[in-house]
A protein has these predicted regions:
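Lumenal/extracellular "mature" regions of secretory-pathway glycan-modifying transferases
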Residues: 2-256, 261, 276-427
Length: 427
């Protein structure tokens, strides 16, 4: 029996497909062992991990919601709208680690910074485009613009954010952004109280005497900073009807609004929403002030802050009520997961960290807690611990480099395909 020889064009096509497949596989699986080994869910990595596994309830004892979570598929398309001084840097690290493990594509700013056009509304020109590749995650500072986000992100994207008690958030922002120094009242005994003696006069004096180009970005957060991040225009800060409508809009458009004061509870809600594992949400706190920089506020000052940032207060009160409604409907498994998360976090701190350190934050003189990784860890554990301490800027640099390589690989493959198409009849 004589076998017919395949046409030369078909042979070339088959070889080409094999080459392209090999390149793609090489790109996505070619990380070093160090890059691939930072999952931290094994028993030996976490003190008490074996007991946690052995003490799990039997399948027959688990609630229906946990069974549904077990069957669901992990969601990988997420917009995390960062708000200022709400614990969002910690959550960003969680998303960054998950995205790296799962080889997801991130929205990366065009400039070498950690902001996507903020304080301006997010626009497509604020991000690096990777041809026809849709990003999976956005978790850099940006100002909420749903119309543009809908064009940029996949249709099934999950939208989440986090807010905080507006009094604590304002006090933290005032300190972190060094508003006392910017506004020329740092020489006062208490710059925060000095500001609230007459905030409008302080701001008018600043406008008349200072170069507005220098610190104007920061001062966008001097009033209703969280709602500003979430898209409310400053002209509407005193319009209660517009505030109410915008709160309802955010309620419709966001799948979850977390609360900093209930951080672990929020993370378990996030885990269940995204169908992730507890190991995906372990964390070290990022961007925290030293305790010595924190202060207690008088009742009078609390009232003034609430009146000054009344839009933020309305925002927080609304979503706090919704949060507690969700909390009241949780099963015992939900609260067990909180306990497991805290145990894992404590174990990782003990295993990974020698001690916390202090370093200056993004804004000059404010001291922020940092991390010192223990020595004599295994290489895999050292990498795992180290990635948990990476701040947003470091991760963005990593993604910017990694995704540039992805773009170059894609363009090389397209060039190869176009070249072959000039002499291989594919039809």
């Amino acid at each position: 029996m004589i076998r017919k020889r395949l046409p030369k064009s078909v042979t070339v096509l088959v070889v080409t497909i094999c080459i392209i497949s090999a390149i793609i596989v090489k790109f996505y699986s070619g990380e070093s062992a160090k890059e691939k080994s930072f999952t931290i869910s094994t028993e030996q990595d976490i003190p008490g991990g074996k007991n946690l596994i052995e003490n799990k309830p039997r399948e027959s004892q688990k609630g229906q919601k946990q069974e549904e979570t077990k069957r669901c598929k992990p969601k990988k398309n997420v917009v995390f709208l960062k708000t200022h001084k709400t614990g969002s840097s910690t959550i960003t690290n969680i998303f960054n680690r998950f995205g790296e493990r799962n080889k997801l594509v991130f929205v990366v700013p065009t400039e070498k910074q950690n902001r996507l056009g903020w304080p301006w509304f997010f626009q497509e020109e604020h991000m690096i485009h990777y041809d026809k590749i849709k990003p999976n995650m956005l978790c850099s500072h940006s100002r909420y613009n749903r119309e543009v986000l809908d064009r940029v992100m996949p249709e099934d994207t999950v939208y989440v954010t986090i807010i905080r008690d507006p009094v604590a958030q304002f006090e933290s922002t005032f300190s972190y952004m060094t508003f006392g120094e910017i506004l020329g009242i740092s020489n006062k005994t208490d710059p925060l109280e000095a500001f609230f003696e007459n905030p409008k006069d302080v701001l008018v004096n600043y406008i008349l005497t200072q170069d507005l180009r220098i610190n104007s970005d920061r001062l966008k957060l001097i009033r209703n900073g969280m709602f500003f991040d979430l898209g409310l225009e400053s002209k509407d800060f005193d319009n209660m009807e517009d505030i109410r409508q915008n709160i309802q809009r955010l309620d419709r458009e966001f799948h979850l609004v977390m609360l900093m004061e209930y951080f672990d509870e929020s993370l378990i809600m996030l885990k269940n929403l995204l169908c992730w594992d507890i190991e995906d949400i372990v964390y070290f706190h990022h961007n925290q002030r030293k305790e010595t920089h924190k202060r207690n506020l008088t009742n009078k000052l609390v009232t003034r802050i609430e009146q000054w940032s009344s839009a933020d207060k309305a925002l927080y009160d609304y979503f706090k009520t919704l949060f507690f409604q969700k909390l009241s409907n949780q099963t015992p498994d939900f609260f067990r997961d909180i306990s497991v998360l805290r145990t894992k976090n404590a174990g990782l701190r003990d295993r990974c960290l020698d001690f916390t350190t202090e370093h200056n934050g993004d804004y000059q003189d404010v001291e922020i807690q940092g991390f010192k990784i223990k020595k004599n860890l295994t290489k895999a554990m050292e990498t795992s611990c180290d990635k948990m301490t990476w701040n947003e800027v470091k991760y963005l640099g990593y993604f910017r480099y990694k995704q540039k390589k992805l773009l170059e690989t894609t363009e090389s493959l397209r060039t190869l395909w176009d070249y072959l198409a000039t002499f291989v009849p594919f039809t």
